[in-house]
Amino acid sequence: TMYGTSSDGSVPPISDAELNLFLANLDCSGKRKELMRCALSLVGRVPYFWGGKSAPGWNSEWNTPKLVTAAGSSSTGTIRPYGLDCSGFTEWVYQTALGVTLYDGTWNQWDATHAITEEELLPGDLGFMAVPGTVPVNHVLLYAGKDADGNKLWVHCASGTGVVLNSPDYVTQYRRRNDVDLEGDLVPAALDVEEAGTSG
């Protein structure tokens, strides 16, 4: 299966070929495709870790045993494989793909975004389980498009699975990052000036 969990509960990583096919079938801007490329690159590779955050790029400490120090979880004070929490994942994706911050925590990410309708959802937009403050623990996800049956796909870092691409039914709030143009294409970062010039 392209997404979800295996019969043993593990999440298989998405292969490069599957990732390229998924991106080719997305009808969205280059910036949004880059968000999806970064997000999907962690599927099955990074575990859930309460309070887990990371600088942009691959973190060599992921999957190594670490003490959970963030308060508020039954895993606090235990040793777990290091990874990301839900908001740490969405922040990592935006930072790695575009150099844009979403801030730490679901509440701050809610405040950095504005409401959109379900019909306005585009890959890279955020989904939340609930309005902050209405549930003890919230959850944030990245919209990834729809599957062949029209089900909404979300890529997110969930407890129990780590980073996964699936179709949870609990997403009730749809949001988009404030003051960031996600509709343009990426400007190549390492364009060689000589290659860009014209030959006579």
Regions found by a protein language model. Name each.
Residues 1-87, 95-97, 200:
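N-terminal capping segments
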Residues 1-3, 15, 31, 105-107, ...:
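General structural signal for secondary-structure boundaries
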Residues 2, 7, 49-50, 103, ...:
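Intrinsically disordered, low-complexity segments enriched in small/polar residues
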Residues 8, 13, 55, 109, ...:
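Intrinsically disordered, low-complexity, compositionally biased regions/tails
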Residues 16-25, 37, 120-123, 148-151, ...:
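Polar/charged alpha-helical tracts
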Residues 67-69, 148, 173-177:
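Short, low-complexity, polar/charged sequence segments that are solvent-exposed and flexible
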Residues 91, 95-169:
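...with weaker cross-activation on analogous glycine-rich loops/strands in unrelated enzymes
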Residues 171-200:
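Low-complexity, Gly/Ser/Thr/Pro-rich intrinsically disordered linker/tail segments
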